[in-house]
Amino acid sequence: MFDVQREELMWGDRKLVLETGKVARQADGAVIATYGETSVLATVVAAKEPKPGIDFMPLTVNYQERAYAAGRIPGGYFKREGRPSEKETLVSRLIDRPIRPLFIEGWRNDTQVVVTVLTHDLENDPDIVAMVAASAALTLSGVPFMGPIGGARVGYINGGYRLNPLVTETKEESSLDLVVAGTQDAVLMVESEAKELSEDVMLGAVMFGHKHFQPVIEAIIRLAEKAAKEPRDFKAPENADVEKAVLEVCEAELRAAYTKTVKQERYAAVDAVKAKVMAALCPEGAEKFPAEKVKAAFKEAQSKVVRWNILDSGARIDGRDVKTVRSILSEVGVLPRAHGSALFTRGETQALVVATLGTGEDEQFIDALEGTYKERFLLHYNFPPYSVGETGRMGSPGRREIGHGKLAWRAIRPVLPPAHEFPYTIRVVSEITESNGSSSMASVCGGSLSLMDAGVPLRRPVAGIAMGLILEGERFAVLSDILGDEDHLGDMDFKVAGTDEGVTSLQMDIKIAGITEEIMKIALAQAKDGRAHILAEMAKALTAARPELGEYAPRIETMQIPTDKIRDVIGTGGKVIREIVEKTGAKINIEDTGVVKIASADGKAIKAAYNWIRSIVAEPEVGVIYDGTIVKCMEFGAFVNFFGAKDGLVHISELAAQRVAKVQDVVKEGDKVKVKFLGQDDRGKIRLSMKVVDQQTGEDITDKIKAQRDAERAERGDEPREPREGGRHRGERRREAGE
């Protein structure tokens, strides 16, 4: 029934298995990839006919995690998976980015890649396995895909690179989390987070990963030789004649349009040239070429004009040379009641970034295959249509917004203070108010400034820069701080963020082969210079975190209590902690380790809650006098609440210096008294005394009582002796004497 084909190899120190022919046989391509005990199913289906009226490649990648893969049942009311999580969206993009450039130009058939995590061993992250499985399924499917690709994760542990480190190693030991993908000849995609590593270490990791995923590519090729379907009958459309005709009509005017340095004016001029081309080559009723081909050829003409200008003269669209960064203006404290805010403007790209501080209650709960955990640092990126002068959809964030936000998150997270030093939940929101390239890097710069404005003690300021590359044969130009057009028309887009000490994040997308290690090295060095310039410009606004938190930010006081006292602070059914919160107005979070975080914008509320909790967990000191309240009178004495929630007994013999016949003759319930803590009896009960304390002044009069008794004994001719203590201990001494 099944024609199963398999390929196995040892990759790193674990086995990778690729299998096809048993599951999802009606798909154009289907592969189950297993690494360790993490298994992923990837399927590919492409429409039989091209989609009419489009000028882009209609590729969709859907990565989905199933709770059963980790032996879990989803939470929520419906107990089933819902909308894609942030990680699912990010991994979908991670797979899409290296495979999209490898489809033959002109492919317009709807193509869907669906990747499903079937099992997760909690050791091997499914994202790399998913990328390999998707590459294999595409290679088998017969669609015009010029792959396969391979992918790998690279860690940096104790000064050495580690291939596909385990999940725990990546989180706890590695100073680098880098994912690289590419073909046999070229690197196509890099995504990474690093702890201020050098450019040389980052580039070394890229090349290390490229070298070590070659066996995977070879295994996919061997599998394809046994199980691949016949290639689709598709050839890239020949547009040379159309492109030539378009250039003849518009080259001079297009070059002139691209000399306009203001984005809106340039776009208007380019649109006018396009309208002229369409009128000349596609007049109504007498089309010389199909309109779709003319539009595609015009885009190609735009690319050629921009690229020729840069390579021939070094002049860019806005008049800069290849290394110059656009003018920068940084402002902080721009919003009066925000905890921290910054407005970062770089040319025609602008980000209004706001930092907000919260407590442990504000941490985000992440429901992942590895289990539920809490995230204390959030960064959200919003890209409204008005930022590019357009109307458009408003609503929940799209894949691009999620991806850009995560890139900025990776750039800033390595310099945040640890939770035990700064116990706040931190949220940064970047509102892109203007955009003409590298808005994600503007979010990094603005995010760093807003956090410092809020008083968050970052290790060092972080800046980011977007770089581009134009490559024609042996000639190339590396572009610093690219515009939107340079991003679309160039051959490489890579973003580097970091401090003056090193790189914290690197994202790279390469659209063509032929980009060598040496070119990437030059590009990274140029990016380092650009980053240093941006950091210097940011320093004009703020060089380090403010010494105090923002006026409206909550203050958090941390205290450690014994774990066996946690239940005393919480109380039965939460009674005690609710009372503290209600009466002080502070927020209180108690961790299992005994760490208590008290938060409020009012310092008095924090102090009141702190003292209340301390009174509950602290132990009274022997010999110290405390204020108390009579809570109950008995025949043998009175119970006094004297130390927070603590009660102790004043024995009838300790109520007053003279003999007391009836407790109520001295005190009644509700009386405010002063008591001395005498210690605990053999049953752990607290013993208190009132008679040795002056109830008016609170003075300890033990010595006065002793002196008075000694004087009385002297008058009687008796030997002086120590004053006796009443209660249980007096009886114990009598019993001991009897023994």
Curated annotation (Swiss-Prot):
It holds the Pfam family RNase_PH_C. Keywords: Cytoplasm, Magnesium, Metal-binding, Nucleotidyltransferase, RNA-binding, Transferase. GO terms for molecular function: 3'-5'-RNA exonuclease activity; magnesium ion binding; polyribonucleotide nucleotidyltransferase activity; RNA binding. GO terms for biological process: mRNA catabolic process; RNA processing. GO terms for cellular component: cytosol. InterPro entries: ExoRNase_PH_dom1, ExoRNase_PH_dom2, ExoRNase_PH_dom2_sf, KH_dom, KH_dom_type_1, KH_dom_type_1_sf, NA-bd_OB-fold, PNPase. Residues 554-613 form the KH domain. The keyword Coiled coil does not apply. This is Polyribonucleotide nucleotidyltransferase. It comes from Methylobacterium radiotolerans (strain ATCC 27329 / DSM 1819 / JCM 2831 / NBRC 15690 / NCIMB 10815 / 0-1).
